[in-house]
A protein has these predicted regions:
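Generic short N-terminal amphipathic or hydrophobic helices
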Residues: 16-17, 26-27
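Non-catalytic alpha-helical scaffolds and adjoining flexible linkers that form interface surfaces
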Residues: 32-308
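Zn2+-dependent metallopeptidase catalytic domains
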Residues: 5
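Intrinsic disorder
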Residues: 22-23
Length: 308
């Protein structure tokens, strides 16, 4: 599938346009921005920059660290002794941090020998809402990528998205833009301009969205397609705008809350279909939002401004 760049005006569009294969095709053409270190042999020691996606405690003092690098893709690394109080590496391996790593090859897991944070994005860990949003960003990349198969455009998109959330950009626009760009880079660009059943050009009216078919279905075809989800014209326009615009242009329009929720629901259904299971972070975010909404109601009630 031939992919366009992120569009003019976005922080991640200055990277070159690539032709990324669908993961289902299995063959990665040369010169596309994808890199597999196995092709050049395994060095004993190497340095790379990476974003920390997640980590897991091992034994009494160690941690398994999963990170994403622009040139080496997803890495599963051992950070020895990092949980000890005097460890110099601990503060440089926080989730979401952009870190420079020196890595030595190991028998089962490669070992982090040095770590120096380039950018830590502390705002992403300052509250549950931002924590959940950042967790969603890294979880989505984690689910879509494979070990040691890197993509510089995907890494650039990841860093730009975390930076936008840390800078308090509106999360709905940041996340929807990220989802559509990542889908494009992974070879799963949804079709919003032609019916995926009959290939006719989509008219300016309500349509259907079918996750299993990867795009919109016209009203005539939609009546006979199972699992077709009604898609309003307004939501279709928003999806098209996000897909073909750079970030600044995509984030500019004000979207009604009901339409914003519809767009989110359709993309979540598509992602769940592709990944064949639900993501964890959206459920966490919904719980946080419900708690915050309940707290706001309680405050209003205590102030005597509630109903009645």
């Amino acid at each position: 599938m031939r992919l366009a760049s992120a569009g003019p005006g976005s922080a991640d569009c200055n990277r070159s346009t690539i032709v990324a294969p669908s993961p289902r095709q299995g063959t990665i053409p040369a010169g596309t921005g994808w890199y597999n270190p196995a092709m050049t042999g395994r060095e004993r020691v190497f340095r790379t920059e990476a974003v920390i996606l997640r980590r897991q405690d091992l034994g009494e003092a160690d941690r398994l660290v999963v990170a994403y690098s622009p040139d080496r893709g997803k890495l599963r690394l051992m950070a020895k002794g990092v949980r000890r109080v005097r460890s110099r590496k601990a503060g440089h391996l926080e989730p979401f941090s952009r870190t420079s790593l020196l890595i030595a090859r190991g028998r089962e897991l490669d070992i982090i020998t040095q770590a120096e944070a380039v950018e830590t994005f502390p705002a992403l860990r300052a509250g549950l809402q931002r924590l959940g949003e950042a967790s969603y960003v890294v979880e989505l990349l984690d689910r879509f990528t494979f070990d040691e198969s890197g993509s510089r455009p995907a890494y650039g998109l990841l860093v730009d998205t975390l930076a936008r959330l840390a800078a308090d950009h509106p999360a709905p626009a940041v996340l929807r833009y990220y989802e559509l760009r990542l889908l494009e880079l992974m070879g799963y660009r949804p079709e919003f301009f032609r019916c995926v059943q009959c290939a006719s050009e989509v008219r300016p009216e309500g349509q259907y969205f079918v996750p299993a078919m990867g795009g919109v279905v016209c009203p005539r075809c939609g009546r006979s397609v199972s699992q077709a989800r009604p898609l309003s014209l307004e939501a279709l326009k928003v999806l098209r705008h996000y897909q073909r615009s750079g970030y600044e242009a995509a984030a500019a329009p004000t979207v009604r809350p009901s339409v914003r929720q519809e767009v989110e629901d359709h993309l979540e259904a598509y992602l769940n279909h592709l990944l064949e299971r639900r993501l964890n972070s959206p459920r966490f975010l919904r719980r946080v939002q419900a708690l915050e909404a309940g707290a706001e109601v309680a405050v209003v009630s205590r102030n005597g401004a509630g109903p009645g």
